């Protein structure tokens, strides 16, 4: 099952959020695949690394203006989008949205 994660990619975030995110992702990433916004920092980076550690399928959906964020990421699939409408459409139509984590 795909898990869509939408969360902060900022490194300037309370450690409390990092601990909770890691705890949740350690469990969720064992039996699910990740769909996320292509950042390897902040809470999004924690999510990415937990799924990577468990050898799960990782799909990124990235705005064209942030394509440099793809550097160094190990992704099984990437969808580049120009507008938020297409971003949301991909998330809802192509992938089974099961879990939403926001900060």
Please provide the spans of the model-predicted regions.
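Acidic/glycine-enriched connector segments
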Residues: 42-103
